[in-house]
Amino acid sequence: DRLSESWLSLYRSGSCPSLVLAHSARGLMDKFNQSIWSTESSGSEELDDKQPLSQGCAAWFADSNKKALLAEVGVGTLDQAMMAVMPFKHNNLRLLGLSDKILLADEIHAYDAYMSRILESLIEHQARSGNSTILLSATLSQQQRDRLVAAFARGAGSRAEAPLLRYDDYPWLTQVIGQEVVSQHVATRKEV
């Protein structure tokens, strides 16, 4: 629901980007179901001249998690993106779907060692492809941060390293920009 309030603001006014929810509960989201075209709405499998073709594309993207990343905006579990760098059937389709996209992942501190390594591979691929990655965590350790920064730097062809942080630097923001890693303290609100 939070995304439904804000995702269109990322696009030009009047545009109609495709949105796909790539998780199992997508059928429970009324706004999402209303945003995609289905043959039940017209009662026919024939194209209706009154329905924009973009709705047909959105429905095609939404009918399979394998195609979900091809939509302009996709929301789902990170494993859908991770399968792009794993030896799965149709991983090349997922890689294509990630091209020219910003990967946004939350709660990245929660992954075990195995999943963290796959995430590092995904981040490295994103950087190698010239794509941006935004990783969010409230409790990411220095070691985890260093490995993720190193993965992005490798993909970008950089040898940049994350500077050490002191305990009182938390919370922090880290950016890999070209050959440089910038880390800075982030001010917090007094009340939440």
Labelled PLM ranges:
Residues 1-192:
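N-terminal helicase ATP-binding lobe
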